């Protein structure tokens, strides 16, 4: 059951229970600045639980179409694994791009790992490999620093592993 609150006072510890992560909190309808606005102390609030699926506490979301580039990191040479969820008509595509420069400049995709070669990822997966023309192998990039550029449409990206 959802709710909307002006004030939240949360416990500092996540609790694992029934296959979810839970956080107890107390919510009040009044905003945090209620005293400055001349209001009295809030009436009794209510205790609730905020719940998350494991491994999905935070993520990047595109409610329509969006793009994000993550800073460079060493490539393991195995696969690019994604933890994501899309709407029924949503998708994600991944590119592996050259090292990002400062100040920012356009960067090109590594050959074989471009947007044009990327396959759509759809649905809901905790760990699915990105594919480029049916291939997932990144051994050609092993040990190189690469940046990752994701194109999302009605999708949430929770984590990546390269």
Identify the meaning behind each predicted range:
Residues 1-162:
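Carbohydrate-active catalytic/glycan-binding domains of CAZyme proteins
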